[in-house]
Amino acid sequence: MIETFNFQGISDRVAASYLQAHGSITWHQIKAQIGRDPACSLLRSYWAYEDCRYDKTRQACSHPRYLRGCPVPSHPLRNGRLNQTAFSFFLFVRDVAGSDLFRWLDDQLAAAADLGNSAAQEALVGPMRHVFGVSDKVLTMTLSAVLMADRRGRPDWFDVGSRMIVVDRLVHNLLVRTGILAGFDATHGYGQHCYGQAGCADILRRVSAKIDARQFDAGFPANFPRYIQHALWHYCAADGLNVCNGNNIDDRKSCEQISCIVYSICGRNALKIK
């Protein structure tokens, strides 16, 4: 999961290239470095680790007297925030999940089993929301991948993960440009509204329920919101099909890409009002 956290705030291609060149960070590395009684009080527990403010460029933090011997800067991650995220997540798993993340996931899902899929998702994302430097979007994306990794062995995990939807700016903008948000009378700016009632995620779930995903792969579940959302992202992303994005469309004008497969039925709404 820590490696996946690197894929935020930058293109996937750049993030992957950096990881390949410099490597990531592992549980065992952090465990060996923190030890039983770290000099910096912030590293003593998950709840104490806040306001670290480690800055890779300036080589500074909120407790400079301990910086030279601190393990946080010792890993060559892309920026200091990612170093903080790695240690914050380690402390979460150690102190909140009892060093057994899979068992914690099982327990959280079991506690929410009778409350519906949304409650199950919140049972996982909610407690992790306070891990430093990770947004709901990144948590949802990462947890979805983990939960869907073993469909045969953990079908209950797969059911929750397959219904997790990640709304990034590309997907939101596609729903604006195509006129889908306007068609649902759900126009809103990118952000938390995307996950609210009649927001992007809600609309994608409604759309997914009408698409039998088994037509794309017989092994898929009939209703597969995560796949539908990812397909839309892939259509837009520069690292994907690179069609519906600001590289190819002037945000102030209607789309002019007549080669787009949905051009004839697209609302072609300008993203920005002049």
Name every feature range the model reports, one short phrase each.
Residues 1-274:
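HhH-family (HhH-GPD) DNA N-glycosylase catalytic core used in base-excision repair
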